[in-house]
Design a protein with these regions (language model features):
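Active-site rim elements
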Residues: 208-210, 257-260, 345
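N-terminal secretory signal peptides that target proteins for export/translocation
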Residues: 1-7
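Outer-membrane beta-barrel pore domains
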Residues: 116, 155, 166-170, 191-193, ...
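Outer membrane beta-barrel
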Residues: 91-243, 265-270, 274-282, 351, ...
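N-terminal periplasmic/intermembrane-space "pro-region" immediately following the signal or transit peptide
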Residues: 22-109
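Loop-centered beta-sheet repeat module
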Residues: 245, 250-296
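Short glycine/proline- and charge-enriched loop/turn segments
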Residues: 197-205, 251-255, 336-340
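Bacterial N-terminal signal peptides
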Residues: 9-19
Length: 444
């Protein structure tokens, strides 16, 4: 693989930044203060854990913020308090005679991408608005409406308006609550928490876009809860994947229905268990299993996904890693059926695998109110890991990527990103192209 002079300078710049600022302390106190303020808006009973160190408080706050957003369906905008319906009784249900305004949140994802030998391509990838409402103390609503690529018109290359989430929470106890509607499938790290400032890199990790579908949502219902001692869970029955859309390059990723013509004839199960009972550490594991014979009459393959992941922070360093494996039963029968229907062999594998590891360093000294993060991520992902009998793997889809870059945060919820991607595959014929990415993202 050839590395251009520009790419070499990019890598050198990042290494110099990391080396030259190795003694700097991360600016996380402002982030902690901001999250504590938002948690107070979400939960008036919240009391900061002042006895913990700053990093421990940040870790605990991120976990509690995720739980609060899911349980209360109230967004954390800076002006959220002023937008809440007000009544003398303090009960949302009794505010019908007043002007009721919904809590509103949102995020934006603007990219400029360039592959080797190609020109720069700007794209307003995502603009998302989130709306929540409390019908009572025990019934909450939450939704996300997403516009992709800035414009919707006829044709396959146009943008898209999509319902990303829309569900009701029925809150019974901290350990047991009912959720129903359009749900994000709880597999991996990024699928449920994908606001641009929450992950490094302009684009989401390849493993969490291909081996695990990205923005994967399905219709369904299930249960959520906080079990105490650092454990929390989500378990859902959802609509199934569509195996007729599986292929060699993206595996099962194109099989998500996103609620359109979804099938519950053979509901799938998805579940996630997380543990954050150790300081600075969050560990999670997810499982998914469901039949996917949807539009493939005569063949009903089962898709099973297992993943483990972990996030750890120590002083100025953040570490993140994930492993995922996908199994597709009856892949050979599926390939033969789809070839009969379309004339093209999709070469769907019976097993797909991916993993990544990412260290990140907070560079700026604590006296600065901004944050500058240098990171590197190695990913290995193979959608042709194991083939059914009679099929050979396509080696161009046995891939690896090195991503190195920086993220500048002038405020905790605003990120300006730059990265360079070194792509490789195992094919001697099809060359993997390197890429350069610039991005701006925010959420409120």
């Amino acid at each position: 693989m050839k590395v251009t002079g520009n790419a070499s300078r990019v890598v050198l710049l990042v290494l110099v930044l990391i080396g030259g600022m190795a003694q700097a302390q991360p600016d996380i106190e402002r982030r902690v203060a901001e999250l504590e303020r938002k948690m107070k808006l979400l939960d008036p009973s919240f009391v900061p854990a002042s006895e913990l160190g700053v990093l421990e408080r940040l870790q605990a706050l991120e976990v509690r913020m995720d739980a609060a957003l899911s349980a209360k369906a109230v967004a954390p905008p800076q002006q959220a308090q002023a937008l809440q319906p007000v009544s003398i009784a303090g009960d949302f249900q009794k505010a019908a005679d007043t002007e009721t305004r919904l809590p509103v949140a949102g995020y934006m994802d603007f990219h400029v991408n360039k592959e080797a030998g190609d020109s720069f391509r700007p794209d307003f990838h995502r603009f998302v608005l989130l709306f929540g409402h409390s019908f009572s103390e025990r019934i909450k609503f939450w939704s996300e409406l997403e516009l992709e690529h800035s414009l919707v018109e006829g044709g396959e290359e146009s943008g898209e308006v999509a319902l990303e989430q829309a569900y009701l929470d029925f809150l019974f106890t901290p350990k047991f609550n009912l959720r129903a509607g359009m749900l994000l499938t709880p597999v991996g790290i990024v699928n449920e928490r994908h606001e641009p400032p929450s992950f490094n890199g302009v684009e989401r990790p390849f493993v969490e876009s291909i081996i695990i579908p990205t923005t994967w949502r399905e219709l369904g219902f299930g249960f959520t809860g906080d079990l105490g001692r650092g454990f929390r869970y989500r378990t859902y029955l959802t609509s199934s994947l569509d195996a007729s859309r599986f292929n060699a390059e993206f595996g099962i990723a194109d099989g998500k229905t996103s609620g359109l013509d979804a099938s519950m004839r053979n509901p799938a199960w998805a579940g996630r268990l997380e543990f954050a009972g150790i300081r600075r550490l969050t560990v999670g594991t997810s499982m998914y299993s469901g039949l996917a014979g949807f539009n493939a009459p005569g063949v009903n393959p089962r898709v099973t996904i297992a993943n483990v992941d972990a996030r750890y922070s120590i002083r100025r360093v953040d570490l993140r890693g994930l492993f995922a494996n996908t199994w597709v039963s009856k892949a050979g029968e599926l390939n033969r059926l789809l070839r009969q229907q379309t004339g093209v062999n999709p070469n769907v594998a019976s097993q797909m695998r991916g993993y990544y590891f990412e260290p990140a360093l907070h560079i700026l000294p604590r006296r600065y109110r901004q944050d500058l993060i240098a990171f590197g991520r190695y990913e290995r992902y193979n959608t042709q890991q194991k083939m059914p009998a009679g099929y050979l793997p396509l080696e161009q889809f046995n891939r690896s990527s090195w991503i190195t870059g920086i993220a500048y945060k002038p405020a905790p919820d605003v990120a300006l990103k730059f990265d360079y991607v070194f792509n490789r595959n195992q094919s001697a014929v099809v060359k993997a192209l390197n890429g350069l990415n610039l991005g701006i993202g925010w959420w409120f």
